[in-house]
Design a protein with these regions (language model features):
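Surface-exposed patches in mature extracellular/periplasmic domains of secreted proteins
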Residues: 22-31, 91-97, 149-154, 180-184, ...
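Acidic helix-start/capping segments at beta-turn-to-alpha-helix junctions
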Residues: 27-51, 99-103, 113-116, 215-223, ...
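Short acidic, glycine/serine/threonine-rich helix-capping segments at coil-helix boundaries
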Residues: 318-323, 331-375
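Acidic, Ser/Thr/Pro/Gly-enriched interdomain connector segments
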Residues: 276-289, 297-342, 381-390
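Secretory-pathway/luminal and periplasmic proteins that interact with or process carbohydrate-rich
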Residues: 36-43, 103-113, 124-128, 144-150, ...
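Acidic/His-rich structured neighborhood in mature extracellular/periplasmic domains
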Residues: 54-201, 212
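Flexible, glycine-rich surface segments
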Residues: 149, 153-161, 166-284, 310-311
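An acidic, Gly/Ser/Thr/Pro-rich helix-cap/linker signature
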Residues: 1-87
């Protein structure tokens, strides 16, 4: 049976698409028979019960098999990859790392119908503007004939192709690298990687020759850890504060005059990095510190670099209940006034820094499982999910 709410959304969306210059009969035909995808709704609304430490994600991403696979692709595909690298001044290793992360070198592009996925997200309403704008982009691709509906397969969130472009990014940045007259990010690896390079340069402002991140160590005991995740500074200023590269050769020359932020994804006991503007360029592709670090570290290993000097600390996963209880504790203690949602974002990290400083702890903002238990004990909160969140 038709979903009345979805049908109301469909009618309103068709009117919006027509107002943006699309033909009503074409839009109606493409959307005919489209119904909400329960699978997409479930994935969009689900928050994992347990959050693995970032170390688990990065160790999985920067695996020996993926490093070797990337090196093999760079060697085998240099005839078409080298011209892309030269034209866009983006390293082959970065492009191939993104290719590996997004689709296992084109093998796993997702099989969800992009039109249906975006229609589902738009009608659900939580990300209506984003989903409707991207859906109009998908309609433009289909109406222009650049792709057919059976090609528009991708992730449940609407990303598609070998390097997982959204429809609007496809329209703006996809290129025809192999010269066959089509911007085929699904079937043509040269088109997909050239499109990614074009995106990194034009939208994300990739800086040639510069690093994405450099592993560093804090050389002084009295370091001010509130500087973690703070404003970027010149490497010389970081060095004056005791933050220096773990590589005894120091920073590569192109990085020496470039401001960088200090990040410690698992706190002061784990690896530390100077994150340069190219780290943020990767985050423009996928706005996740973990993703950008994984791409940068994977690229470094493909280029012959060694593993991290500072190992990741052993830390057990935290549950949604743990994280919500930590936010409740920070609220009760007067450090946090944001939403209790289990998402430990910048607001929670700032609050955690204040609490850590009050306890004489390194104020890096990272809440390990052990620290969450200590925080809860102090505030008298427990790891129970409020009824409103279940």
């Amino acid at each position: 049976l038709p979903d009345p709410a979805f049908e109301a959304w469909r009618a309103g969306f068709i009117a919006k698409a027509v107002a943006q210059g699309l033909a009503e009969d074409q839009v109606t035909a493409i959307l005919a028979g489209v119904q909400p995808d329960p699978h997409v709704l479930e994935l969009d609304q689900r928050q994992p019960e347990f959050s693995k430490p970032i170390s688990s994600y990065i160790n999985g991403a920067v695996s020996a098999g993926r490093i070797a696979g990337g090196q093999a692709r760079i060697a085998a595909d240099h005839l078409w990859l080298d011209p892309i690298v030269n034209r866009y001044q983006t390293p082959a290793e970065i492009l191939v790392a993104i290719w590996a992360m997004e689709s296992a070198f084109g093998q796993l592009q997702g099989d969800d119908d992009v039109v249906r996925s975006l229609a589902t997200l738009a009608a659900e309403g939580r990300r209506k503007t984003f989903a409707e704008d991207e859906l109009i982009g998908a309609l433009r691709i289909l109406i222009s004939g650049e792709a057919v509906r059976t090609q528009l397969k991708g992730s449940w969130a609407g990303a598609m192709g070998q390097t997982q472009f959204t429809p609007l990014d496809y329209l703006a940045y996809a290129v025809d690298e192999d010269g066959d007259g089509r911007r085929d990010i699904w079937g043509s690896a040269p088109d997909a990687l050239a499109s990614t390079a074009n995106f990194l340069v034009k939208k994300a402002h990739w800086r040639p020759e510069q690093s994405a991140q450099i592993e560093v160590a804090v050389q002084i005991k009295a370091f001010d850890y509130t500087l973690v995740d703070g404003p970027a500074k010149a490497p010389a200023d970081w060095a004056a504060l005791g933050v220096t590269p773990v590589d005894p050769r120091g920073l590569p020359d192109p990085d020496k005059g470039v401001d960088a932020a200090l990040i410690m994804p698992m706190g002061w006991q784990g690896p530390a990095f100077l994150a340069f503007p190219n780290h943020m360029a990767i985050r423009a592709y996928n706005n996740s510190v973990a993703y950008a670090l994984a791409v940068g570290l994977l690229a470094d290993r493909m280029a012959g670099g060694g593993p991290l000097v500072q190992p990741w600390p052993a830390d057990q996963p935290t549950s949604l209940a743990d994280r919500m209880a930590a936010q409740q504790a920070l609220t009760r203690l007067g450090y946090y006034s944001g939403e209790v949602d289990g998402l430990l974002g910048s607001g929670t990290r700032k609050a955690a820094k204040l609490w850590q400083a009050s306890q004489g702890l390194p104020a890096d903002g990272y809440l390990s499982y052990a620290l969450i238990q200590r925080l809860n004990a102090q505030a008298g909160t427990a790891a129970t999910i409020p009824a409103a969140a279940t």
